[in-house]
Amino acid sequence: MSMTASLALTVPELILSVGALLLLLVAAFGGDGFARAIGWGAVALFAAAGFSLTGPAGNGGPGFDGLYIADSFAAFAKLLIYIAAAVSVAVAPGFFSRTGGGYRAEYPVLILLSGVGMGMMVSAGDLLTLYVGLELQSLSAYVLASFMRRDTRSAEAGLKYFVLGALASGILLYGISLLYGFTGTTLFAGISDSLAKGMGTGQMFGMVFVFAGLAFKISAVPFHMWTPDVYEGAPTPVTAFFASAPKVAGMALLLRVAIEAMGSGTDTWRQIVVFAALASTILGAVAAIGQTSMKRLLAYSSINNVGFALFGLAAGSADGVAATMTYMAVYVAMTLGSFICVLQMRGQDGQPVETIASLSGLSRSRPGLAAAFAIFMFSLAGIPPLFGFWPKFLVFDALVRAGFWPLAMVGIATSVIGAFYYLKIVKTIYFDDPAPAEFAPAASKLEGGLITLAALAVSPLGYLAIPLLDATSMAAARSLF
């Protein structure tokens, strides 16, 4: 493939990277007075990048001699990433203005650059492309976590994320070096051909280290330790971003590496994935029960949900991968809706309300917000008829079809345990004695509109999208096999 044809495959990344540089120039000369305009410019760039997926960038095949892959799988993941990133940019100005943190023009630019990295991650066809994309996303994320530099919690979150992220990157690089040393290539196709001839001890160790590095990025147990502290300390729009877009990118990257690069060693890596899935669902469900902070509880909820998504990968089939992609699509809607609800929860003094006990009385002062948050909690718990039930059903169905019904039974049990803390929040909102402090009225029609859209998406109306989701997720999954 010619250089021009290869570049045509990377149009989404070109749009975001060139746009980020132009917006950075505007910020340099215009200052923070242009911050809101730059933010909406970033949203427009994400929309343009998503629209470009209708061309060769959506299904053009491999480019740059296999280093970059533009297929249905990458297009599906990128669309979710761009939606989550755009929402995270759109809701940020209101939060920073209310908290006095100061909304600066660098925020949307960092999200754009992170989007470029995530796009490279899901389209990677080579271990080095994987690493460059992952590091571009991570470096932007470290700065975003500590964006409110005068807030000690935010600074602490950024430092913890940076130190542990650097450790995970080192582990990943070591795994890449082992795989290169024992297979003689960094291309996914070449690694797959090498493993098809038999997996040696060195190759197995390389695979384990690569999986460990990627597990950190998706907060899978036992590499989850950074998640509760970073989610709690980072600004809430940043936390919403961390819990959605990078999760999709990391999960998509793990799926591509497992199926395309290491499909010949499925029986070996399945043991790792099964352990991570079980540990994540169990720890996420149990550890969340004792939490008092809303953001920490949602952090453990994200760990729990990653475990369920990994069950689809453990099935090792196209049905399992399609179920995982459907799970991530619905998860993005539920998570963004939940965090925007948290953004709306403020006292009369304008300060955020982040403790679960403070939610008592929300149903009286903000009945609409309380109802929406309850919908998201029930949906995250997977309680029918809400749409959050459907992806869990697909994941368990894929496990049973693959013959792993004991794993499905454990997953169902942890889902029941996890429902406890979601129901605890609903009970606090509707049945506990009202807290003395009153909630401030809604201050953003945009946030209210986004909450409404997300609530409708995870309501029973979401089942109308099943034919579309099934078709697109299965097309995405089949492009890996």
Curated annotation (Swiss-Prot):
Name one process (GO BP) from the record: ATP synthesis coupled electron transport
Q: Which reaction does it catalyse?
A: a quinone + NADH + 5 H(+)(in) = a quinol + NAD(+) + 4 H(+)(out)
Q: Source organism's superkingdom?
A: Bacteria
Q: What class of enzyme is it?
A: translocase
Provide this UniProt record's keywords sorted from A to Z.
Cell inner membrane, Cell membrane, Membrane, NAD, Quinone, Translocase, Transmembrane, Transmembrane helix, Transport, Ubiquinone
> Topology relative to the membrane, per the entry?
Multi-pass membrane protein
What EC number(s) does its UniProt record assign?
7.1.1.-
A Gene Ontology molecular function term of the record: quinone binding
User: Which InterPro entries does UniProt cross-reference here?
Assistant: NADH-Q_OxRdtase_suN/2 (IPR010096), ND/Mrp_TM (IPR001750)
UniProt key word Manganese: no
What residue ranges are annotated as transmembrane? 14-34, 38-57, 76-96, 108-128, 162-182, 204-224, 235-255, 272-292, 297-317, 323-343, 369-389, 403-423, 449-469
NCBIfam families named in the record: NDH_I_N, PRK05777.1-3
Quaternary structure note: NDH-1 is composed of 14 different subunits. Subunits NuoA, H, J, K, L, M, N constitute the membrane sector of the complex.
Q: What does this protein do?
A: NDH-1 shuttles electrons from NADH, via FMN and iron-sulfur (Fe-S) centers, to quinones in the respiratory chain. The immediate electron acceptor for the enzyme in this species is believed to be ubiquinone. Couples the redox reaction to proton translocation (for every two electrons transferred, four hydrogen ions are translocated across the cytoplasmic membrane), and thus conserves the redox energy in a proton gradient.
Family the entry assigns: Belongs to the complex I subunit 2 family.
Name of the molecule in the record: NADH-quinone oxidoreductase subunit N
Q: Which source organism?
A: Rhizorhabdus wittichii (strain DSM 6014 / CCUG 31198 / JCM 15750 / NBRC 105917 / EY 4224 / RW1)
